[in-house]
């Protein structure tokens, strides 16, 4: 081996040309391997509010699922009932009778309960409802419009035996009748004297008529459902149109006694005459006493009937007022229980 080769310090090629030794050492950094356990990390701590919101969200989700299931069940039942109803209507329309309706529905496989059969038969055999009553004690200048009452009665009775549901809907509608009364245009009271007692509970102006409309309710009996609307006609201001809704559940109030009216008329006439008028007045006719007895009896009967009606209505109003009071119920229960304990036999 040549001596110049052995004396050569190194054959490595160093690319760090012109750099100091300290800089070269600084550039070399040790590599550190960090192992992280992603599967066994500790869970993060949740905020109590977030946990409460998550629990509430889960509860609402479960409740929504239950409601969805209930809604689906109700919808299925509704569809089944609707299909049964359509089958019954179709069968009744084809046969045109109550008996045919029941036979066809059972022959097609549908089950009809006996109560439903009895209900349909009673609806088919029931007589038509009576026409709405008209006030009989109205003055001679009142005129009942026959068209409205006849139309309402025709609408209620125009129903075939194969459509019981339509008949039920028609019977549920209140009976409507109209009454036309001539009145003074300057009178703003909107009062129609038809023989009944009314209580006004409202008044307003409608779009189709500049005259106001007054609303009344029958006050003769506490449970009477009849209502009345009074308004002047848009074409003629001298006519009052009274619209009645419903039917009275009581008799007509008795009219005032004729004898009292005659006495008041006689006293008014005698008071309005001049001083020389009594000399020219005709003498009173001589009538046997027996002819006056029926008049007195009729007046007494009317007064007794009126007092009995007023007494009965007052008792009904008092009973309704007492039954609505909870303290009265408690007192009644206490009194009855005490009376029962007093009457019950005591054991020695």
Curated annotation (Swiss-Prot):
It holds the Pfam family WRKY. PROSITE patterns: WRKY. Residues 91-141, 246-287 are annotated as: Disordered. Residues 126-136, 275-286 have a biased composition (Pro residues). It is found in: Nucleus. It comes from the Eukaryota. Its main location: nucleus. SMART domains: WRKY. Residues 187-253 bind DNA. GO terms for cellular component: nucleus. Highly expressed in aleurone cells. In seeds, predominantly present in the plumule, radicle and scutellum of the embryo. Expressed in roots, stems, young leaves and spikelets. GO terms for biological process: defense response; defense response to fungus; gibberellic acid mediated signaling pathway; gibberellin metabolic process; negative regulation of DNA-templated transcription; negative regulation of gibberellic acid mediated signaling pathway; regulation of defense response; regulation of DNA-templated transcription. GO terms for molecular function: DNA-binding transcription factor activity; promoter-specific chromatin binding; sequence-specific DNA binding. A motif (Nuclear localization signal) lies at residues 116-122. Residues 102-114 have a biased composition (Low complexity). Residues 267-348 are annotated as: Transcription repression of gibberellic acid (GA)-induced promoters. Keywords: Coiled coil, DNA-binding, Gibberellin signaling pathway, Nucleus, Plant defense, Repressor, Transcription, Transcription regulation. Residues 50-84 form a coiled coil. Induction: Induced by biotic elicitors (e.g. fungal chitin oligosaccharide and fungal cerebroside elicitors) and pathogen infection (e.g. the compatible pathogenic fungus M.grisea race 007, M.grisea crabgrass BR29). Accumulates in response to M.oryzae. Triggered by defense signaling molecules, such as salicylic acid (SA), methyl jasmonate (MeJA), 1-aminocyclo-propane-1-carboxylic acid (ACC), wounding and pathogen infection (e.g. X.oryzae). Repressed by gibberellic acid (GA) (at protein level). Induced by abscisic acid (ABA) in aleurone cells, roots and leaves. Interacts with WRKY51; this interaction promotes W box binding of the complex WRKY51/WRKY71 in a zinc ion-dependent manner. The WRKY domain (213-266) is required to bind DNA. The C-terminal region (267-348) is required for the repressing activity on gibberellic acid (GA)-induced promoters. Transcription repressor. Interacts specifically with the W box (5'-(T)TGAC[CT]-3'), a frequently occurring elicitor-responsive cis-acting element. Represses specifically gibberellic acid (GA)-induced promoters in aleurone cells, probably by interfering with GAM1. Regulates, probably indirectly, the activation of defense-related genes such as GF14E during defense response. Modulates plant innate immunity against X.oryzae pv. oryzae (Xoo). Confers resistance to the virulent bacterial pathogen X.oryzae pv. Belongs to the WRKY group II-a family. This is WRKY transcription factor WRKY71. The gene is WRKY71.
């Amino acid at each position: 081996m040549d001596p110049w080769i052995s004396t050569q310090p190194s054959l490595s090629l160093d690319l760090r040309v012109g750099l100091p030794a300290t800089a070269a050492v600084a550039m070399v950094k040790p590599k550190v391997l960090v192992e992280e356990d992603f599967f066994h990390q500790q869970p993060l701590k949740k905020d109590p509010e977030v946990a409460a919101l998550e629990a509430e969200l889960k509860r609402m989700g479960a409740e929504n699922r239950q409601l969805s299931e209930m809604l689906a069940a109700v919808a299925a039942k509704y569809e089944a009932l609707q299909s049964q109803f359509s089958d019954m209507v179709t069968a009744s329309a084809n046969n045109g009778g109550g008996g045919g309706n029941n036979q066809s529905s059972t022959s097609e496989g549908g089950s009809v309960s006996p109560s439903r059969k009895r209900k349909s038969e009673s609806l088919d055999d029931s007589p038509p409802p009576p026409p709405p009553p008209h006030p009989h004690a109205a003055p001679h200048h009142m005129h009942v419009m026959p068209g409205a009452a006849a139309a309402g009665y025709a609408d209620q009775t125009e129903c075939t035996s194969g459509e019981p549901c339509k008949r039920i809907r028609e019977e549920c509608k209140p009976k409507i009748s109209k009454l036309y009364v001539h009145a003074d245009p300057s009178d703003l009271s909107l009062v129609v004297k038809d023989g009944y007692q009314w209580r006004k509970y409202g008044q307003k102006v409608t779009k189709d008529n500049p005259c106001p409309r007054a609303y009344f309710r029958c006050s003769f009996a506490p449970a009477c459902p009849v209502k009345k609307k009074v308004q002047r006609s848009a074409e003629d201001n001298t006519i009052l149109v009274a619209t009645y809704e419903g039917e009275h559940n009581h008799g007509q109030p008795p009219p005032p006694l004729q004898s009292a009216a005659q006495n008041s008329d006689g006293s008014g006439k005698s008071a309005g005459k001049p001083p020389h008028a009594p000399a020219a007045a005709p003498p009173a006719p001589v009538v046997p006493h027996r002819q006056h007895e029926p008049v007195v009896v009729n007046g007494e009967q009317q007064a007794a009937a009126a007092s009995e009606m007023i007494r009965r209505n007052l008792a009904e109003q008092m009973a309704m007022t007492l039954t609505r009071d909870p303290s009265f119920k408690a007192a009644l229960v206490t009194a009855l229980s005490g009376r029962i304990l007093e009457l019950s036999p005591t054991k020695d």
